């Protein structure tokens, strides 16, 4: 049976309070140097540490020297988890097994506590190119054909990685026609078929609830919460009447409310990760990052007061 890597920091999912982590960005370097103990783990985006020369090239991938040296230094002091952005596991026309093998190679190198990706499509077939990168995660219609497709790909991915894959719920700004089941029913069926885990992004869910007009709490009630291994929390902002998943600094109160309501119900929750875009670091500041970590700990273990500044 596929297992997570055991960690002296994170332990085994479901055996104690969830760990508190940060999505790494360059603006965090100073804080992590001064306070390496402020976070239990770091989540990294592997694709930002290597160069992809394209499917026709051999060798196709090469580590970026400066970025990889930084990652090696981070790995000396922090437990790492991987959060991929390029797999495009739900693309109907293409599936990139070389990308999976590259991720597996990095898993062997860094022994990620777990690996996650997005339940989405970023690559599509167009008239101009059979493998066009859309530049953003595209929304999906939840149907049985897609379930069959993604189930097969998740199984192959987990076999190559040698570990369980977590899949993250995405962002939708407008209704998507063509579904014959709910997103939660789709995810629950995928978990049953493949044994994969769930990365529940609470801010993504809030974005969808605001823009599409549904109740986020009721949405969560329909999800198999025993499959949730990681959660993401983040902030956003409004633009032209639409609420965006912009990772714009501190989390809104609605995200904290969802975390406090949901985390105790997730029996296998291993970690909660705060993510923000580094362009918002001047406004958030290091104290702001520490405050977000404090609030995460308070939500997970209410008797925790704060992290010393």
Residue ranges and their predicted role:
Residues 95-197:
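Active-site acidic/histidine proton-transfer and metal-coordination neighborhood
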Residues 42, 115, 201, 231, ...:
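Conserved, mostly hydrophobic/aromatic
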Residues 283-307:
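C-terminal helical cap(s) of enzyme catalytic domains, especially alpha/beta-barrels
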